[in-house]
C-alpha cells in the first residue's frame, strides 16, 4: 500500500521523488480514465503525507494520450518516460505532443528487441557492445543534455547483467562483473571524466558464406577486436541455442545452454564452428576482455536448416 511506504521513506535522504505507477496507462491509447483517476488520487494522497518530494508517473514511451493525461493530472509533478530507440527524438516529440511538465528519462538503453528489424527466420540482430555504448551517448545527449530546463535526469537500463531476449542485449555488465563500453560512456557523461582504461572495442561479426546452413556444417565467422590502450585482449566464443523469447516484458529468464564442442577454433580474429545436427535457431557469441575489468561482446544469429521438432 502507498500510505505505509510513504510514511516509512519520507525522511531518508536517498529518496528523490515518488513514482506513482510504472507503465500503468492502460489501453493501447493510454487513456483509461479509471487508471488516471487512481494515479492522480494516489499522487494527491502522497503529496499530503510528504509535501517535500515531487510526484512522478512513468509511461512506456509517449504514444496515444499519455502526454495529455500526465499533463492533466494535477497531483503529478513530473512525467517519467521509458524510451529506448525513441530516446533520440524524445525531447522533440514531447514538446510537439504538448508536454509541459519536466520529465525524467526513467529507462533508456540500446534499441529494444521490438525496435530491431528481424532477419528472415525471425531472429533480431543484436548491436555490438561498442555500438550500444555509442547509442547510450547519443540518447543521453539528445534526451537529457539536449533538453535543459525540461529533462531532469535519467536512469540507465540495465546496470547489471540480465538475460532478456539474449544473454547480452540489455546488461551493461557481464555475469562475471566485467564492465562493457556503456559503463565507460555513462561514467564519462555523469562525472565529466572518461575512465583511464577503456573497455575493448569490437566490430560486428562477419559470417563467411550464409548463416543458414545444413546440420553439422562447419562455419567460419570473422571478428575484429581491439584494445583502446593497445593491450592484450582475451577472447572466447560460445554457441548457444536461441531463446526465441523476444518480448519477455522484463521477466527473468534462464540463459540458453551452450552447445558443447561446437567451437573448433577460437581466435581473436574469428572462430570455426561446427553447427549442431538438430535443426533450429542458434546464436554465436564473442566475449572479449582485457586485464582491467573491461569487456566487449558481439553475436550473430545462425540457423540449422530442417524441421524443428517440438518436444511431446
Regions found by a protein language model. Name each.
Residues 37-145:
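Extracellular glycoside hydrolase catalytic/binding regions
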Residues 234-274:
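Exoplasmic/lumenal beta-rich domain surfaces
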Residues 95-250:
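Substrate-binding clefts and catalytic carboxylate motifs of secreted carbohydrate-active enzymes
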Residues 280-284:
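Exposed beta-strand face motif in extracellular beta-rich ectodomains
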Residues 297-305:
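C-terminal edge beta-strand
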Residues 232, 293-297:
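A structural signal for beta-strand boundary/capping segments at domain termini and interdomain linkers
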Residues 2-33, 56-67:
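Active-site groove signature of glycoside hydrolases
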Amino acid at each position: 500500500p502507498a500510505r505505509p511506504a510513504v510514511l516509512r521513506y519520507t525522511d531518508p535522504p536517498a529518496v528523490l521523488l515518488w513514482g506513482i505507477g510504472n507503465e500503468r496507462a492502460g489501453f493501447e491509447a493510454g487513456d483509461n480514465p479509471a487508471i488516471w483517476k487512481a494515479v492522480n488520487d494516489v499522487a494527491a494522497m502522497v503529496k499530503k503525507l510528504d509535501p517535500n518530494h515531487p510526484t512522478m508517473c512513468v509511461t512506456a514511451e509517449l504514444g496515444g494520450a499519455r502526454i495529455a493525461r500526465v499533463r492533466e493530472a494535477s497531483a503529478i509533478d513530473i512525467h517519467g518516460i521509458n524510451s529506448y530507440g525513441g530516446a533520440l527524438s524524445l525531447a522533440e516529440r514531447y514538446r510537439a505532443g504538448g508536454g509541459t511538465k519536466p520529465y525524467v528519462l526513467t529507462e533508456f538503453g540500446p534499441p529494444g528487441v521490438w525496435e530491431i528489424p528481424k532477419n528472415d527466420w525471425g531472429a533480431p540482430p543484436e548491436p555490438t557492445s561498442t555500438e550500444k555504448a555509442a547509442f547510450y551517448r547519443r540518447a543521453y545527449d539528445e534526451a537529457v543534455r539536449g533538453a535543459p530546463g525540461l529533462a531532469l535526469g535519467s536512469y540507465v537500463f540495465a546496470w547489471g547483467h540480465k538475460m532478456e531476449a539474449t544473454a547480452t542485449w540489455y546488461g551493461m555488465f557481464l555475469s562475471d562483473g566485467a564492465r562493457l563500453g556503456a559503463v565507460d560512456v555513462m561514467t564519462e557523461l555523469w562525472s565529466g571524466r572518461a575512465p583511464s582504461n577503456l573497455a575493448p572495442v569490437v566490430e560486428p561479426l562477419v559470417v563467411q558464406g550464409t548463416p543458414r546452413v545444413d546440420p553439422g556444417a562447419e562455419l567460419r565467422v570473422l571478428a575484429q577486436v581491439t584494445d583502446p590502450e593497445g593491450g592484450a585482449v582475451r577472447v572466447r566464443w560460445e554457441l548457444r541455442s536461441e531463446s526465441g523469447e523476444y518480448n519477455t516484458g522484463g521477466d527473468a529468464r534462464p540463459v540458453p545452454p551452450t552447445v558443447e564442442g561446437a567451437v573448433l577454433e577460437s581466435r581473436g580474429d574469428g572462430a570455426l564452428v561446427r553447427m549442431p545436427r538438430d535443426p533450429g535457431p542458434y546464436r554465436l557469441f564473442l566475449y572479449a576482455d582485457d586485464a582491467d575489468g573491461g569487456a566487449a561482446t558481439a553475436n550473430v544469429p545462425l540457423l540449422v536448416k530442417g524441421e524443428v521438432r517440438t518436444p511431446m
